[in-house]
């Protein structure tokens, strides 16, 4: 049996000048990202010993066209780690806002298979909850997608008169806007969603 070294995506991107997309990088422990420091600062990748039969560590000069895109959720999200200051100092950070209404409608319509008129109501409901100023955490488009997909599976309609829709929307949005697990907050959130359903659906 013989060993065969296979370069990972990071090595390939550094070698050939590709763009590395590192999705939700703050889910990794900070020490797991240490190798990125020399790549971004000194433009050198430290390769492991015994790579391709070599006995000592060697280095790869990072291609001048190499770029990296890192995505992350805010640090207060469950499961995220605080990013190293040293790593943040080596990147440009852009805070992204929510999509505009038209884009959210298009995403929910295309990913759920619901009619555009129903996607509009879901988007307006989620956006109204965001703007209410009463959420511990603001609901994202994911909450709207979950509602839309659950409705499609259950054959329910986006209507204040549809009990299945009301339950689905209240359950998902109350859960999406709270991270503390407080029963009082959950009930308060369900009540707020019920009121918004009357206004927007």
PLM segments and residue spans:
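C-terminal regulatory/interaction module of P-loop NTP-utilizing enzymes
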Residues: 1-201
